[in-house]
Amino acid sequence: MATTTATTSLLALLLLFLVALVSAGRDLVGDFLRLPSDSGNGDNVHGTRWAILFAGSSGYWNYRHQADICHAYQLLRKGGLKDENIIVFMYDDIAFNSENPRRGVIINSPNGDEVYKGVPKDYTGEDVTAHNFYAALLGDKSKLTGGSGKVVNSGPNDHIFIFYSDHGGPGVLGSPAGPYIYASDLNEVLKKKHASGTYKNLVFYLEACESGSIFEGLLPEDINVYATTASNADESSWGTYCPGEDPSPPPEYSTCLGDLYSVAWMEDSDRHNLRTETLHQQYKLVKERTISGGLYYGSHVMQYGDVGLSKDILFHYLGTDPANENLTFVDENSLWSSSKAVNQRDADLVHFWDKFRKAPEGSPKKNEARKQVLEVMSHRMHIDDSVELVGKLLFGIEKAPELLNAVRPAGSALVDDWDCLKTMVRTFETHCGSLSQYGMKHMRSFANMCNVGIKKEQMREASAQACVTIPANPWSSLQRGFSA
């Protein structure tokens, strides 16, 4: 009887407590059912959000990549992430570039906000390297060369978000200083990070041409990594908000302001309470917007790794802007606008041609712009012709096109021997000059040489015959070193 009375009294006290909470305006459902990582101030009780933002290019003609990264930084800060947990890699030659019509300002869309202010200068200039990227992700300060020294010092309950934007090619991603990021190396770093037990889940958003090849056949499904890419393994990604397109940048700009996949996920994130939107919902929305051009432009957004993680809400990785608290995600009214786009590999041509078009006739600016157009076109012709001739010397005139352009079955990695691929690239560049951002498109040809057993000495002889001289222009110069 005493036990029954005590139980009744306890229930009565609990009821009074709940009534008091309701009277105080508390959200009982939210309080009792809130997810472990839900925290209004962005500091997760059971873990920390970390982010690495990497712009892999330099040069004003590549404005859009650093604009993407700066936009992502502002989005994460509004979402509640702290500067100490956001690591930024960007060459930082855009905001105060002499060609920038708005000195000290970077925008990511025609009517967009200024996104450069406040962005941390963690790794800039020649410190933006694949080597430092890997060290920062692994939390290994001893392996850093230059930079702020900031690394992902994460623990087992933490969530990590990585966003990369730049040019790419089959199996590679660009880096403005030092060798490129190779798919095999990147995936090994991700596996090493998982083996260290220093994160709960990791999400990787990747903007680059042939970006699907970075993870296809390489990224395990059991290391708690979910990745989406701007394109599949054998197609270009696309720049957007470009001169002459609709919508175009303000008339004083001669360069694309953003990339189609990148602005798609960020403009969606800017407009919603990310507690109500999952990674999968955003993937579907971005996929639809990025392919909207059909046969004329656009690419196929892909997903890799632990696809089961896509059920997570974006809030776990990006936080959410308190101003969007009432902007619940709904598939039918997600406020995205169609925008024309330019193939990533041709976006620099858009810039140089726009400069030439706008320069006064007979002026020094006109002559300089003409020189730049001719140099970039000459370099492209040299690279294309040289790779084609190397192929003919190795395989014969009839077989070369098929062997150089062969695409492996879906789900297969680009190449079996990644060290061989690096050797082929370095040997070619020794005799023919830098591949540069444009030449990354030929990585599949070099990979196929490895896949059929071509040796370094054969490649050396063919490259030496194909390239008697290296063109004297900045694109072909090896001043910045080899790509491998």
UniProtKB/Swiss-Prot annotation:
Gene Ontology CC terms, in alphabetical order: vacuole
Residue span(s) of the pro-peptide: 25-44
Glycan-carrying positions: 326
Pfam family, one: Legum_prodom
Positions of the catalytic residues: 167, 209
Signal peptide: 1-24
Keywords annotated in UniProt: Disulfide bond, Glycoprotein, Hydrolase, Protease, Signal, Thiol protease, Zymogen
Gene3D superfamilies, A to Z: 1.10.132.130, 3.40.50.1460
Similarity-based family: Belongs to the peptidase C13 family.
Protein role: Asparagine-specific endopeptidase. Probably involved in the degradation of phaseolin during and after germination.
Protein name (record): Vacuolar-processing enzyme
Organism this protein belongs to: Phaseolus vulgaris (Kidney bean)
Lineage: Eukaryota, Viridiplantae, Streptophyta, Embryophyta, Tracheophyta
